[in-house]
From Swiss-Prot:
It comes from the Bacteria. This is NADH-quinone oxidoreductase subunit D. The keyword Ligase does not apply. Pfam families: Complex1_49kDa (PF00346). It comes from Rhizobium johnstonii (strain DSM 114642 / LMG 32736 / 3841) (Rhizobium leguminosarum bv. viciae).
Amino acid sequence: MTEHNVRNFNINFGPQHPAAHGVLRLVLELDGEIVERVDPHIGLLHRGTEKLIETKTYLQAVPYFDRLDYVAPMNQEHAYAMAVEKLLGIEIPIRGQLIRVLYSEIGRILSHLLNVTTQAMDVGALTPPLWGFEEREKLMVFYERASGSRMHAAYFRPGGVHQDLPEQLVQDIGAWCDPFLKALDDIDNLLTGNRIFKQRNVDIGVVSLDECWAWGFSGVMVRGSGAAWDLRRAQPYECYSDLEFDIPIGKNGDNYDRYLIRMIEMRESVRIMKQCVNRLLSDAKTGPFSSIDGKVVPPKRGEMKRSMEALIHHFKLYTEGYHVPAGEVYAAVEAPKGEFGVYLVSDGTNKPYRCKIRAPGYAHLQAMDFMCRGHQLADVAAVLGSLDIVFGEVDR
């Protein structure tokens, strides 16, 4: 019998690959078409965000968070704003909390819509992205009407939100909800029962619950494996404890379960949005939307025209910024991709001493190796789509 010299084949997947979602470079070791090893090379989008934040005042650091997970920008600002508020010990008025929750859920829908539809595109379905982007476009307009920008909003500031929502905008968001559920049903009917979509996702990228905890997973990745762990329920922040919503969990921990969870979560987000809209139009219709002590949030323009103190105050807040008491704090929100945390160290000056950003996608990407082992080459793209990776937050 002749001896065969077996040599595994190494290929590069990315960084300019259409399924690589940005600037991912994977070095794959293949035995025929079976994946033996996956080696993610990251850092191609590294911008030194954490170091840059140390040279900026607390207010100037806000826009950096928009540019991390840039498909759902306001959710990142939320974690940072909460960290600064914890250090300052300030409370947000209820109207400000409702506006924050409303826009956090809009961000969740933005992210899940993009993920579910591009995952469908990765496995060959071309219609869902067109429908998904149609709905995302409407949500981007809501972002723009609240903050003036479609993506990089810088709308959640420490102390509340930057400006109030007009009543008409709140009504328009309420009117968007039901037609969206119908559009979601269309995408659902197209994908959920689709034979090819199921063949490409069922039993691919299976993760057990123990492996989830060992690899530091969070968000949809743990819920897909059967843990009902959601920071909005486990460690409620803002006014989530007063809102009604369910947490979907999967039982197989595969790509398909994670897809189903994202679909259900979009429906739950709409449910939360409806509750926020109702309250913003009834009991929280008027009242302050940001902290009123005047130490953190700059005074209103009208006040500055009348009062010299307000003008001085405004000037101080935008040049020097406010001083945050020394200490360290960790604040986390349930971002669309998982637990997005900000560990903030203050030395009592007007600039953060250290700001560590805990991006959920970073922990998920490192598990590519053990999730893809033994699968076909084509399944690498499916697993990658299911992880929901955005490089802004992975490379920071």
